[in-house]
Amino acid sequence: MSDYKDTLNLPKTSFSMKGNLANKEPMILNKWEKQGIYKKIREHFAGREKFVLHDGPPYANGSIHVGHAVNKILKDIIIKSKTLSGYDAPFTPTWDCHGLPIELQVEKKHGKAGQSISEDDFRKECRKYAKKQVEIQKKDFKRLGVLGDWEQPYLTINFDYEANMIRTLAKIIENGHLSKGFKPVHWCTDCGSALAEAEVEYADKVSPAIDVKFKIKDKDKLAQAFGLDSLNHDAFAIIWTTTPWTLPANQAIAVNNQLNYSLIKIEDFYIILAENLVEQTLKRYAIENAQIIATTTGNKLTGIIAEHPFYSRHVPILHGDHVTDDSGTGLVHTAPTHGVDDFTLGKEHNLSMEIFVKGNGCYSENTKLFAGEFIFKANDRIIELLGEKKRLMNSDKIKHSYPHCWRHKTPLMFRATPQWFISMEKQGLRDKALQAIKETSWAPSWGQARIEGMVKDRPDWCISRQRTWGVPLPLFIHKETEELHPNTIEILHKVAEKIEKDGIEAWFNADDCEFITETAQYKSVKDTLDVWFDSGSSSMCILDLDKRLSYPADLYLEGSDQHRGWFQTSLLVAMSAKGSQPYKEVFTHGFVVDEHGRKMSKSLGNVTSPQDIYNTLGADILRLWTASTDYKSEMAVSDQILKRTADTYRRLRNTARFLLSNLDGFNPVTDIIEFDKLVKLDQWAIAKTKEFQDKIIEAYDKYQTHTVAQLIHHFCSIEMGSFYLDIIKDRQYTAKTDGHPRKSAQTAIYHIVHALVRWMAPILSFTANEIWDATPKTTDLPIQLCEWYTGLKSFDQDAELDLEYWAKIQEIRSEVNRVLEIKRNEDVIKASLEAEITIYADKYNYKLLEKLGNELRFLLISSKADLKVIEESTSSSIAANIPGLLIEITKIEEPKCERCWHRSSTVGDNPQYKDICSRCVENITTEAGESREFA
């Protein structure tokens, strides 16, 4: 037996079978750094149509988590796909660097500002800490393969950014959107500051739920309201509340003029309840012997005076539109300094706005009985006092959704304080914002309704904070009238100039006289700006000013929580400062959860860190998982899910390796064969690749990365692995090295690789780089500078063997494979090359298959394939799952060719080559080798 190994075209490539990504990727990153790849991309695509994806700034505090990784990877995929489409698509990373979380970290080390450390030094430490965190996060983002202008990121602590925030504020004031107000705002006692809507989280909380008796002072007036002559017992208005601590601030009881109210006799006193709530309220009190005396409307009750349950204070009953009979008692306890509706009612009726609670959550000195106590701890004492005063009708507990601080996770309170607001009503900002939302494209589509609902219902935006580490609110107000200085706009521009030179310290360390001369009449505001104003200003501070970018951005892409966060604050800043929305399109992705749909937490032990993933599996696995997951809903990740992703990656890598290994010796300059002269199956492969490329580009354009990933996987595993590559192995390995059949397949493979590597590049950035390095090509450009491959061709409309024809052949082949498997299991054959396949076909299928002539066997990977009319079928034939088709498999008895392994009667016909078939002899001995037309 001879050794024919040297006569075969064995696969050969520098592209390794094993990814070894965790070790290779850092080396590839290093190469990109040395090449200055991002700069080269910018230079190469300069002058092209721009596509700007504006990066929402992550907070510079702590290592990135998998949610951060998902966000940056999705952005990177989109940017790279747009670059492939020929756009100049820059990516400038941003970071949010002011605010409470950084303050807290610095406090842990240095103590509170103004106590253990000066405020000036505290700010310096905050800036130092933020910069350090940026470098940590930057390193992680770069390790993920994310390309961007990492050397010139936008940080909200950059002096020019801080200055441009002040200039943005000046525009907002100039446009008439700023107002000062004494209003209830969400207040965190731990922060010692007001919070914006976006900083409020809702979580379940168990609270006391009490019904309190307010004694009616004028019984005769109450009797008259109910149409009675008189009342012979005391009467009480009953309110229900889950915040007993607000009772010291009670100034009124609210009813609704349109609701009906009942007077109910219980033993020796009367109570007032909304008519529709009587039954459920009495049931809650476990009272069965109550008697409804009379009913009246709310408007008859207004003006009646009650007595505070534990203070010597008169409490009027007033009408409030916000009062309903859905729950509680239908009478609402009103503390104007601790609720929005309460405050509105208080202003309308000139109720006392006395402050009873300080910023630290303790009652002020003027709070009788409870001065100095922490409000939430005082609940029990207040309930106890109500009991002693016989003013407690009922006491219970309730579990309900309650606002908490996004950072401290502690319950918030509503507290009226003097603050600065961007008014939603002045200059029609709310209506303008709602119109801008309609003019923006939202995906998923429900995002539009979500943000519309939030903007419709949101209060004025409180932009002032009582913090140390933040951009100042550098205003001057009159010491008596508290009106803004008449030259506020000019002053703000002067402040901005100084900050641009020396940072925010230029304001905090300056004397008022550096900015104004009327220091006797005006004082400076000591507040800082809400950190959401920092990030919300990015469209004005970056897009509107950086000539490398453009306003509005083409795309904002963030997590779905940003409808109430950055999407909204960006919109409000842009609309109030510039009068137009900052984005054309807004996409959101879901949160990352574990495989059971649970939020990730250290306590559950289900945290998957991006660092662990890229240090073990490689960043490309994380990128592939991100792209493969439909990010419009929650994104599940776990070790098991990543293992499945790694399996998918291996299939893709193996496909790429097979393709590359069969391009050994191929010169694209001299060896390319024209489409019309290719073997028909190779024509199909190119046309099929073109069909997939069109779908893939469309999916990329719609940001449907999971569709892209599915298409690439299907292409590699089904169209290539299970069909085309399976069939051409024989031709590639055994045909004449320089013969037409092999060069035809290599031409197709060349086109396929050039398309496939580009499809992969936005997602599998490191692997695509490897593939590109191992690919024969006619360009020196790195893959990052390439555009979509244009060397593919579709079939002409009149092509006889078009995609539809080959799809039918694939169906028939699948049925043959099914029957082959049956015969393998029956031990009739061990491999398909041992099989003689006979297909019995009706007229339609016969006509399809006869076009392939004697090359049908190559498509079926058998040594012999016969086509016969269905009427000749035998009892041993098996019906296919295709009408008009039967298949018969028998074992072929002819000898095996030691070179191609086909069974052939021609083995030994040539005395010089006794153990190979005539086809192999032809491929070894003749100049042209065998010929192929179809497969």
UniProtKB/Swiss-Prot annotation:
Obligatory cofactor(s): Zn(2+)
InterPro entries cross-referenced by the UniProt entry: aa-tRNA-synth_I_CS, aa-tRNA-synth_Ia, Anticodon_Ile_BEm, Ile-tRNA-ligase, Ile-tRNA-ligase_type1, Ile-tRNA_ligase, M/V/L/I-tRNA-synth_anticd-bd, Rossmann-like_a/b/a_fold
Domain remark in the UniProt entry: IleRS has two distinct active sites: one for aminoacylation and one for editing. The misactivated valine is translocated from the active site to the editing site, which sterically excludes the correctly activated isoleucine. The single editing site contains two valyl binding pockets, one specific for each substrate (Val-AMP or Val-tRNA(Ile)).
Binding positions for L-isoleucyl-5'-AMP per the UniProt entry: E558
EC supergroup of this enzyme: ligase
Motif range ('HIGH' region): 58-68
Example GO molecular function: tRNA binding
Compartments where found: Cytoplasm
Residue numbers binding Zn(2+): C897, C900, C917, C920
Record text on cofactor binding: Binds 1 zinc ion per subunit.
Protein's name in the database: Isoleucine--tRNA ligase
Keyword list, A-Z: Aminoacyl-tRNA synthetase, ATP-binding, Cytoplasm, Ligase, Metal-binding, Nucleotide-binding, Protein biosynthesis, Zinc
Function per UniProt: Catalyzes the attachment of isoleucine to tRNA(Ile). As IleRS can inadvertently accommodate and process structurally similar amino acids such as valine, to avoid such errors it has two additional distinct tRNA(Ile)-dependent editing activities. One activity is designated as 'pretransfer' editing and involves the hydrolysis of activated Val-AMP. The other activity is designated 'posttransfer' editing and involves deacylation of mischarged Val-tRNA(Ile).
Binding site for ATP: K602
Organism of provenance: Francisella tularensis subsp. tularensis (strain WY96-3418)
Family statement drawn from the similarity comment of this UniProt entry: Belongs to the class-I aminoacyl-tRNA synthetase family. IleS type 1 subfamily.
Enzyme Commission identifier(s): 6.1.1.5
